[in-house]
A protein has these predicted regions:
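Primarily secretory-pathway and cell-envelope proteins
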Residues: 2-7, 23-76, 108-161
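Surface-exposed ligand/attachment interfaces on beta-rich extracellular proteins
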Residues: 77-96
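A short tyrosine-centered beta-strand micro-motif
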Residues: 101-103
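Bacterial N-terminal signal peptides
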Residues: 8-18
Length: 161
């Protein structure tokens, strides 16, 4: 019985400590939190799924600032782990425009992924189209015309070419 407890404690400790050794967790953007100069003018959707923010330079450096809604479609987006769902030109007030995009992973383990749904006809959406890169490698993707929903995932910087 004593051996069972020791093994159980060892396994529990390993489970708790293991994530710390794998790689650092991605820090989710927060309103007024610092962001790097490499993200200047990038937008993202906060985890509340309602607040859009843009990385802007201020007196104290770069920070995430609330974006006025509605806003013009942006050509640079940051996905930071959880899926962010945006709207394309198949909907009023699109968040991004169709065309060629490149997703660049922000670390060597990240896989950039995008799922798109387009408008087929009034009230009808296409089957979701999935594109996924390789770990640490850029993903080039064509955002479809009449794009309705687009889900961006991974710790990636998405830029319109």
């Amino acid at each position: 019985m004593k051996r069972f407890r020791l093994v159980s404690l060892a396994l529990a400790a390993a489970a708790v400590l293991a994530p710390g050794f794998a790689h650092a967790d991605v820090v989710a953007p927060q309103l007024q939190a610092p962001c790097g100069a490499d993200l200047a003018d990038a937008m993202t959707l906060l985890s509340d799924e309602r607040t859009y923010v843009t990385c802007q330079e201020g007196a104290a450096g770069y920070a995430w600032a609330a974006a006025p809604v509605p806003f013009e479609p942006n050509d640079t987006w940051l996905s930071y782990g959880p899926v962010i769902t945006l709207h394309g030109q198949g909907m009023r007030n699109p968040n991004l425009t169709s065309g060629r995009w490149t997703a660049t992973p922000r670390d060597s383990e990240t896989v950039c992924r995008v799922q798109q749904e387009t408008v087929v006809e009034a009230g009808v959406l296409s089957t979701p189209q999935l594109s996924e890169g390789e770990p640490g490698q850029p993903l080039e993707v064509a955002m479809a015309p009449k794009l309705f929903y687009v889900e961006l995932a991974g710790n990636c910087l998405w830029e319109r070419d």
